[in-house]
């Protein structure tokens, strides 16, 4: 069972993710707990027990996080249940998923097409949305490359464990 401090950390994560990203608090609590739990892979039942929540609440939170690409589900041979863990190698979990910004740019351009004959002031928000999204689409791949090089340097220096070894 987790300690009171670990539950408090999960609660803090729940509030942060609810406030900053509009997630359900349980999804944020689940992310927080998955960041600190041992072992890293947990079943729905284990997570429900640890977080003092129903299995359905955990399953719903896990489905939300899975849809967002923040967790990975796995199942060992012969097991009848999934095990869940944070997937730090997925582009969405690290913030490097450019498709989100491509979709935002496309949506802004769709709006701009509707306002083709409108004055520039009316199009200003959509023009800036498209420009910002295009900027991120262009810059994120290089930033991701820089992050991966930095992460490898931290691992080589022993300052960051290799999470690939702990799957």
Label each region the model flagged.
Residues 2-28:
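Short alpha-helical segments that sit at the start of domains
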Residues 20-21, 35-40:
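Short helix-capping/hinge SLiMs at alpha-helix to coil transitions
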Residues 21, 26, 76-97:
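Short, cationic-aromatic polyanion-contact patches
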Residues 46-49:
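A short acidic, leucine-rich amphipathic alpha-helix
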Residues 69:
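Glycine-centered, phosphate/nucleic-acid-interacting loop/turn motifs that mediate DNA/RNA or nucleotide
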Residues 91-137:
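Amphipathic alpha-helical dimerization/coiled-coil segments
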Residues 117-167:
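C-terminal regulatory/oligomerization modules of transcriptional regulators
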């Amino acid at each position: 069972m987790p300690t009171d401090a670990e539950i408090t950390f999960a609660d803090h994560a729940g509030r942060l993710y609810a406030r900053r990203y509009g997630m359900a608090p349980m999804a944020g609590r689940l992310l927080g707990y998955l960041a600190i739990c041992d072992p890293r892979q947990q079943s729905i039942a284990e997570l429900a027990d640890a977080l003092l929540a129903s299995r359905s609440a955990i399953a719903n939170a896990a489905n939300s996080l899975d849809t967002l690409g923040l967790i990975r589900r796995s199942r060992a041979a012969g097991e009848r249940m999934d095990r869940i863990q944070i997937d730090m190698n997925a582009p969405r979990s690290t913030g490097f998923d450019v498709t989100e910004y491509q979709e935002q740019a496309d949506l802004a351009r769709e709006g701009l097409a509707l306002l083709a004959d409108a004055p520039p002031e009316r199009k200003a928000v959509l023009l800036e949305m498209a420009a910002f999204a295009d900027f991120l689409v262009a810059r994120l791949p290089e930033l991701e490359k820089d992050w991966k090089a930095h992460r490898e340097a931290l691992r080589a220096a022993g300052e960051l464990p290799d999470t690939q070894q702990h799957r």
